[in-house]
Amino acid sequence: MVSWPGLGTRVTVRYRRPAGSMPPLTDAVGRLLAVDPTVRVQTKTGTIVEFSPVDVVALRVLTDAPVRTAAIRALEHAAAAAWPGVERTWLDGWLLRAGHGAVLAANSAVPLDISAHTNTITEISAWYASRDLQPWLAVPDRLLPLPADLAGERREQVLVRDVSTGEPDRSVTLLDHPDDTWLRLYHQRLPLDMATPVIDGELAFGSYLGVAVARAAVTDAPDGTRWVGLSAMRAADEQSATGSAGRQLWEALLGWGAGRGATRGYVRVHDTATSVLAESLGFRLHHHCRYLPAQSVGWDTF
């Protein structure tokens, strides 16, 4: 009996072809999307290969190729366009975003250009201070050299997977603007002018039977990849967040993104519930991001 790895893992699966086929066996190489009731493997071309689990004769787990720094920078460009805040500006390779202090991703400076350097942090701090906002830096892996330990740090994982179109669950409602039900379930104060901005992209606000909500944004990366990013996940309870409600909601939003040309999906996670849901849907680690207060000790000597 085959012992299946987690969904999203790169695999080679050898399976039997229909009786009389020559050769009698063939291989599917790609990302494992499902194992029951049908095995589904997505190849690097995007083709999905399907076959019965009883026809599987061998399985090999493949190592993921190392993520290039350029790929991290490209994804972060797309993610920044998905949460640009209500005010933004470029400063020496940094994108500075402000939005009433709500949602850290839209109230932080991120070093997107290769020219970004820590010697700009004093000016970044002044920009946020002039708006009565805490100056936060969002620093993805390898985009900027940092001191090893800085005070007030918060870490996020950025997880990714391939996406494809599909029929959404009829229990999922998708809107291009958050309604009262969506805002009520979100629980926190999220001004509309914070929730709805996107740079050269499209938004969807999804809800599942009034027990779970999430936001999706389709934006483009400089390398040409079109991404759909999931965020603002809230649910009535943890079971709704990690169970069928969360899965159906996310799948519907990913399918919506694929229908608008997205080929890859991402989500930023910093809590267990979101991580469990993401991994159950085949998301895998791409890189980390660190949020740091700009006044952290060590910037002036680094």
UniProtKB/Swiss-Prot annotation:
Q: What GO molecular-function term can you cite, just one?
A: acyltransferase activity
Q: What class of enzyme is it?
A: transferase
Q: How does activity depend on pH?
A: Exhibits stability over a wide range of pH (5.0-9.0).
Reactions this protein catalyses: L-lysyl-[histone] + acetyl-CoA = N(6)-acetyl-L-lysyl-[histone] + CoA + H(+)
Q: What induces it?
A: Up-regulated in acidic and nutritive stress conditions. Detected exclusively in intraphagosomally grown mycobacteria.
**EC annotation from Swiss-Prot or TrEMBL:** 2.3.1.48
Which keywords does this chain's UniProt record carry?
A: Acyltransferase, Transferase
Q: Does the keyword Acyltransferase apply?
A: yes
Summary of temperature dependence: Stable up to 40 degrees Celsius.
Q: What is the additional note?
A: Expression in M.smegmatis leads to enhanced growth rate and altered colony morphology, and promotes the survival of bacteria under acidic and nutritive stress conditions.
Q: What does this protein do?
A: Shows histone acetyl transferase (HAT) activity with recombinant eukaryotic H3 histone expressed in bacteria as substrate and acetyl-CoA as donor. May be involved in survival under stress conditions.
Q: What is this protein called?
A: Probable histone acetyltransferase Rv0428c
State the organism named in the record: Mycobacterium tuberculosis (strain ATCC 25618 / H37Rv)
Q: What is the lineage of its organism?
A: Bacteria, Bacillati, Actinomycetota, Actinomycetes, Mycobacteriales
